[in-house]
UniProtKB/Swiss-Prot annotation:
Claim: NADP is one of the keywords in the record: no
Keyword set, alphabetical order: Fimbrium, Secreted, Virulence
A GO-annotated cellular component: extracellular region
Domain of life (superkingdom): Bacteria
Family, as annotated: Belongs to the HrpA type 2 family.
Protein role: Major structure protein of the hrp pilus, which is a component of the type III secretion system (T3SS, Hrp secretion system) required for effector protein delivery, parasitism, and pathogenicity. The hrp pilus functions as a conduit for protein delivery into the host cell.
Name by which UniProt lists this protein: Hrp pili protein HrpA
Location relative to the cell: Secreted; Fimbrium
Main location class: secreted
Amino acid sequence: MGLGGPLSSATSFASKTLEGAMSDSMAESAVAQAAKMKIDTQNSILDGKMDSATKEINSGHNAAKAIQF
């Protein structure tokens, strides 16, 4: 038998398996975080547009109220 034999092979296999799982997990997490950042940015832009539209509508209403006949 070689140095360590089956135990050494099992340990090496387990270590490589865990390294692969951690690598996959980190990659999936990075992809999910990038997608969330993109969605958060889009939502922030849309919120700003909605706020501007609301201010414009309110300004129009206030101007209409100020007109006296």
